[in-house]
């Protein structure tokens, strides 16, 4: 069950993704990192068909790096979100990607404390949010996040909320898996230790 989950906390964005790659009813691997570090202050969470997911996220990552090399400054998170949305939307007519994305980033110039969180689906829709999730997890977690999430949560409280979310998923899903947790802030990207309930 593919799960992408991200929400804003004080000073940054917490991002969680499952680590499994499945094909039909077979689990191919359980140590896949679905949270791509685009640069020092941007994370791209992706879910979908394995080939589309890897190819599209690598294409996006390399083009954003090329932009920063050509212009001598990095692409802002809002600009990256619009670039990704445009690539998804234009590919629908030629080669549609079966992929859903969440982009999280930190920019000094952005309002709301510098943090940005964007939700994108395979049809190219784009929405700026305070929290978002993709996959079957969204059926269970959106209500829970609506009730418990606040943008001024401390990092520790945010991690506790992530534990609450993964506990809910363990309760609802037949199969539970491993997760990867990352945090993006003004200090850069950190991989945080995270033990989902067994």
From Swiss-Prot:
Pfam families: Proteasome (PF00227)
Transmembrane stretches, start-end: none
Alphabetized PROSITE patterns for the sequence: PROTEASOME_BETA_2
Assigned keywords, A-Z: Cytoplasm, Nucleus, Proteasome
GO biological process, one term: proteasomal protein catabolic process
GO cellular component, one term: cytosol
PANTHER family: METALLOPROTEASE TLDD, PROTEASOME SUBUNIT BETA TYPE-1
Protein name: Proteasome subunit beta type-2
């Amino acid at each position: 069950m593919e799960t992408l989950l991200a929400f804003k906390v004080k000073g940054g964005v917490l991002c969680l993704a499952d680590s499994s790659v499945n094909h039909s009813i077979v689990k191919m691997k359980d140590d896949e990192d679905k949270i791509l570090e685009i640069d020092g202050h941007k994370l791209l969470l992706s879910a979908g068909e394995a080939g589309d997911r890897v190819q599209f996220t690598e294409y996006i990552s390399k083009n954003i790096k090329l932009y920063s090399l050509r212009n001598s400054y990095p692409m802002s998170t809002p600009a990256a979100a619009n670039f990704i949305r445009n690539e998804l939307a234009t590919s629908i007519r030629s080669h549609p990607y079966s992929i859903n994305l969440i982009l999280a980033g930190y920019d000094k110039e952005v309002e709301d404390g510098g943090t940005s969180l964007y939700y994108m689906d395979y049809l190219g829709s784009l929405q700026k949010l305070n929290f978002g999730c993709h996959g079957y997890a969204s059926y269970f977690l959106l209500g829970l996040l609506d009730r418990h999430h606040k943008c001024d949560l401390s990092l520790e409280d945010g991690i506790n909320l992530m534990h609450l979310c993964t506990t809910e998923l363990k309760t609802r899903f037949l199969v539970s898996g491993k997760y990867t947790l990352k945090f993006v802030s003004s200090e850069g990207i950190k991989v945080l230790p995270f033990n989902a309930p067994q």
